[in-house]
Regions:
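Metal-ion/cofactor- or nucleotide/acyl-coenzyme-handling active-site neighborhoods
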Residues: 1-192
Length: 192
């Protein structure tokens, strides 16, 4: 979120003597690298992607710094991530690790998560992918995965604003255009 810039968290992290793991969301990856939060300084470096929108997410990977550092970053990818992003990560030497975001109560017979998990089984993964509650955004998903998968319990969260800044017009939010189209311009329905 915006606090990562207003509070200069990236600059502080880059200048620190912190020697633990870095878990970054895809949306902040390029900025983190530009500010010196790189896998050269922090050797356990992870980047998570959950978004399946191939147009919006691409810009977070289309940079020379991603080219330079991808082979030192472990990319944690949701099974629904945009295919062009996965191709890009492979192209620049990044290592991909997969998970399946839980969409609903997965043991239920009509569960979307259950169907997705079944479709992801194969000879290499007879049980499918690990299922993880993601809380609907990269930051919260990273927090959950840092604890539950990577067993990191001392965590400093930066830039996890859990929403948009106060006063931000709805029209400037990230998926406004898609929402506007989905409700056929009837934004009163959304504001209610």
């Amino acid at each position: 979120g915006p606090s990562i810039f207003t509070l200069k968290h990236l600059e502080k992290l880059a200048a620190s003597d912190y020697n633990g793991a870095i878990f970054t969301s895809d949306g902040i990856l390029i900025d983190a690298l530009k500010h010196g939060v790189t896998p050269e300084k922090f050797s356990n470096y992870y980047c998570l992607s959950v978004d399946g929108n191939s147009e919006k997410i691409w810009k977070w990977y289309d940079d020379r710094l991603v080219d330079q550092y991808a082979n030192k970053i472990k990319f944690i990818l949701n099974s629904t991530v945009a295919h062009n992003v996965y191709q890009r990560i492979k192209e620049v030497g990044g290592e991909a690790y997969w998970f399946n975001a839980m969409m609903d109560y997965w043991p239920g017979q009509e569960s979307i998560t259950r169907v997705m998990s079944a479709s992801l089984r194969g000879p290499r993964r007879p049980n499918g992918l690990v299922r993880i509650a993601t809380a609907g955004n990269c930051g919260a998903s990273l927090w959950i995965q840092a604890c539950s998968i990577f067993r990191r319990f001392t965590i400093c969260l930066i830039g996890l604003d859990m929403g948009y800044p106060d006063g931000m017009p709805l029209e400037q939010t990230y998926y406004y255009d898609k929402l506007f189209k989905a409700v056929q311009g009837n934004m009163e329905f959304v504001k209610a």
